[in-house]
Regions:
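Shared catalytic-loop signature of beta/alpha-barrel
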Residues: 1-70
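Charged, cofactor-coupling segments
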Residues: 76
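Intrinsic disorder at enzyme termini
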Residues: 79-80
Length: 80
């Protein structure tokens, strides 16, 4: 990220994993000044993520909030 920032190159984080990786990308991205976007599979927000966690992803004007709460802000379902 620092090398990209030095040369004015935007950085993109890529996540096609689960809610833990998504939360980690959001927290990391919040601290990268040259972040362009976090790429993810939006269909997972309503299908895959609710099976594994209680995390609710709310897209607002193309933006995602950084999860809050202890740790990364993700609570896994024990039944998953």
């Amino acid at each position: 990220a620092a090398l990209a920032e030095t040369y004015g190159v935007p950085l993109v984080l890529h996540n096609v994993a689960g809610p833990i990786c998504h939360a980690a990308c959001m927290h990391l991205g919040a601290h990268i000044p040259n972040l362009f976007f976090v790429e993810s599979v939006r269909a997972f927000y309503r299908s895959y993520f609710p099976i594994l966690s209680t995390m609710e992803v709310a897209v607002s004007n193309g933006h995602l909030p950084v999860p809050s709460g202890p740790g990364l802000g993700v609570t896994l379902r024990e039944t998953a």
